[in-house]
Amino acid sequence: MAEKPKKPQKLRARLPRGLADRGPAEIAATRAMVEKIREVYERYGFEPVETPAFEYTDALGKFLPDQDRPNEGVFSLQDDDEQWISLRYDLTAPLARYVAENFDQLPKPYRSYRFGWVFRNEKPGPGRFRQFMQFDADTVGSGSPAADAEMCMMAADTMEALGIPRGSYLVKLNNRKILDGVLEAIGIGGDEHIKQRLVVLRAIDKLDRLGLQGVEQLLGEGRKDESGDFTRGASLNAGQIRDVITLLNFAGWGDIVDGSNTHTLDEWEGLRFSVNSTFSAGIQDLRQITKITEASGYDTGRIRVDNTVVRGLEYYTGPVFEVELLLDTKDEKGRPVRFGSVGGGGRYDGLVSRFRGEPVPATGFSIGVSRLQAALTLIGQLGNKPQAGPVVVTVFGGEIAGYQKMVATLRKAGIRAELYLGNPKHSLGQQMKYADKRNSPCAIIQGSDEKQQGIVQIKDLILGAELASLEKDRDEYLKKQAEAQFSCKEDEMVAKVQELLQRRGVAWG
Amino acid sequence: MAEKPKKPQKLRARLPRGLADRGPAEIAATRAMVEKIREVYERYGFEPVETPAFEYTDALGKFLPDQDRPNEGVFSLQDDDEQWISLRYDLTAPLARYVAENFDQLPKPYRSYRFGWVFRNEKPGPGRFRQFMQFDADTVGSGSPAADAEMCMMAADTMEALGIPRGSYLVKLNNRKILDGVLEAIGIGGDEHIKQRLVVLRAIDKLDRLGLQGVEQLLGEGRKDESGDFTRGASLNAGQIRDVITLLNFAGWGDIVDGSNTHTLDEWEGLRFSVNSTFSAGIQDLRQITKITEASGYDTGRIRVDNTVVRGLEYYTGPVFEVELLLDTKDEKGRPVRFGSVGGGGRYDGLVSRFRGEPVPATGFSIGVSRLQAALTLIGQLGNKPQAGPVVVTVFGGEIAGYQKMVATLRKAGIRAELYLGNPKHSLGQQMKYADKRNSPCAIIQGSDEKQQGIVQIKDLILGAELASLEKDRDEYLKKQAEAQFSCKEDEMVAKVQELLQRRGVAWG
């Protein structure tokens, strides 16, 4: 027996992990969010500037948290000229390159904003995306605490512009100098301990997820997780660990009495670390920042010092901030969800300097748009309802060109409309099923009889759907049934459709 | 002598070739364009859907023009699981994957639009970008000529919505079947000649750039370009070349008499190739399409058959279209620029089928947003004028918090405002220079005297700039000088600034 010819293998339609398609509701929600954020950032005097998706790998630097191998976490490839290029993993590192490259032409301080996709080559995991959107604002060329204060206030204003009520978010403020001071005080300051300090930083950054005990393990020899994987710790001794934990226990959440951060800062200053000048400078920064925010009416209900905040990115050098959503809500399966951080930022005085060879202070704030959008969707702040679809002009034999002309007439009047482009032999029922699936407000019907009379039938699909839920034979039903399909002259079609759209409250946008 | 310690090498701030940063005017122009295109596409009944930047390399397929090595032209890298992934080189191939993956849930025909960045790993060259923006619409699941006709009409409507006057653009329409028919007729039909046909296609696609003689060389043995590089040709014999050139000479530009494409199509049908059924089917398609477009009022001044159009992408199977800008204009250096194609598309009946193993007809249209934007900017259709900057509150000693509060007050009233965040010891002159560079409409000044009196000075920077061009000592000058800086009570500041903004016609957006 001869072998059967092999059937050619079909290509499988699928996406690489950590990537997602986006439908109409999601796209509309992102657009609405982006517009609101932009409005706030522009009110704060920031102007747009955008950089491309790729940068030279060395220009981006290696500042990602949780990455032990070089280049891990970043999508990189070698260019034709052998140089390595990478997709941006955030919007800050590319901005630093941009400012350095255009330094002399830019106003200083240089205040700019941008949003766009960033890429991280993360390990697989639920909810871990490899492409997501950020919206950043940065002030480069100012070392003033007022610049940091502004970022915190803008973060708060942005949350409220997005419909998150006061009390449901918190901008948490800390200073890398405070932790640095403690680490100096316990004997791991200096360049020779730079790696160890980084491990400490990453351990503290996991406080939310692992709790104090987990952090304690990571400050010591290390920690074995549920899967049995072991993460090496910072190898601090027992006394050193106790000191760091003391600091973390002093977050100062308990003693807010009059909306001022002063009391918490006084307490921190009372710690024995304050003999260390770095620690003490960190406190002074925070005093200046909170003095400004509080004078502008932002009390501890909105902006609050919290020394558990460290931010994972390596490039921060001073004040750091994080926006936390305080909403507890349930996911689709009824499980409680705590959103945690939806944005953050801080001072990165070293990032532009890498290119310039001179100090260039800078501070910035970044919103995780994709993450925040997921949160807002869950609390119902973003519409998930599909928009009304287009008016569908159905097709029954005859000349396609005639039907197409009706469509053109509707479109010319600004009405979203389309010709049924499926098989023109499909029944009215099949064409209506399509219109329903498109969420169309109405359909236009013209058979040969209507054509001869110069009329069209207009079928109100919104009313039609209501009818389906009414008891038949009642007066209301019969009245509505008459209203749900009616005829008019061809040249009245536009006006009648416009009336129907208004009657049904259809407004596209 | 001991060696000097090496100075650490400064990182160079630069972008990889073929990538560009974008400033405020460019970003605003893209936004305006995208909004207008979206409005037209939605009026045509298309709904948004977006795919991510990456796809599996095999899902994208290899359809790029001008690429001889596999994978050339595409940015690809190997994922952790050894599978190859690539950045999308257009928006059509990813859509085909999306439709195939979600086939059962989608309405059919499925009409969708999307815009976004695409990436091509092009060889270096002026004006050749490796990241650019496209805006696409596609109808998947309809083989109707009405679907193709709609793409052509939408292309025309979009150009006009973007401010390109009728007569300054042309949608050119052709059919791959016509060329295929000719190639069958001259003996290079069939699977065994697939590569040769592709070389012919690419040769014709270069007609604009190389002229008939260059195409003739590429149809034959090949062509040596100015740099001495040799491109191998399709190796057609003299008779075959003559036949293809005959076709190209029959573009039919000369005989437009009444705005109808019929005459041109009649002429094509008169060619001896029309005994070939593929050729003849191609003509019939075009007759149906142009019948629809002409019935809807789109004459040959807007949509015209032209058999020199082939489109470079391999995946087209039937009608193809291209939008050409007919504007001749000059670049910054006064050299004439002809923009050529700013968009195009066609029918790609095989692209979704690769995944489905069943026929899925589809047609689409794509605007090269970046390319069109360059053209519109050059003809002055897009504003290049920078927007007004924010109101700048200047700083003179005293408490920063007090100045910041003024800024917060202005912002709360919806006024774009910022604190001067440069060195607070900078002189008024230095701070004004910054405000000028930001294009600020006015600045707020409060020294210690003003503070004691509870007043602020408002400096009108727009009027100030006008003053600089007036002769001094004239009445007008003195009057304006008084108007250009005035004082008011602190609590009148918002109202006075709002008046000034209105007086100077400052409207942010």
UniProtKB/Swiss-Prot annotation, chains A, B:
Gene3D superfamilies per UniProt: Anticodon-binding domain (3.40.50.800), Bira Bifunctional Protein, Domain 2 (3.30.930.10)
HAMAP family reported in the protein's UniProt record: His_tRNA_synth
InterPro entries: aa-tRNA-synth_II, aa-tRNA-synth_II/BPL/LPL, Anticodon-bd, Anticodon-bd_dom_sf, His-tRNA-ligase, HisRS-like_core, HisRS/HisZ
GO molecular function: ATP binding; histidine-tRNA ligase activity
Protein name: Histidine--tRNA ligase
Catalysed reaction, written as an equation: tRNA(His) + L-histidine + ATP = L-histidyl-tRNA(His) + AMP + diphosphate + H(+)
Subcellular location: Cytoplasm
Taxonomic source organism: Rhodopseudomonas palustris (strain TIE-1)
Family: Belongs to the class-II aminoacyl-tRNA synthetase family.
Enzyme class: ligase
Subunit (UniProt): Homodimer.
Biological process, per Gene Ontology: histidyl-tRNA aminoacylation
Top-rank taxon, per record: Bacteria
EC assignment: 6.1.1.21
Keywords: Aminoacyl-tRNA synthetase, ATP-binding, Cytoplasm, Ligase, Nucleotide-binding, Protein biosynthesis
Record's GO cellular component terms: cytoplasm
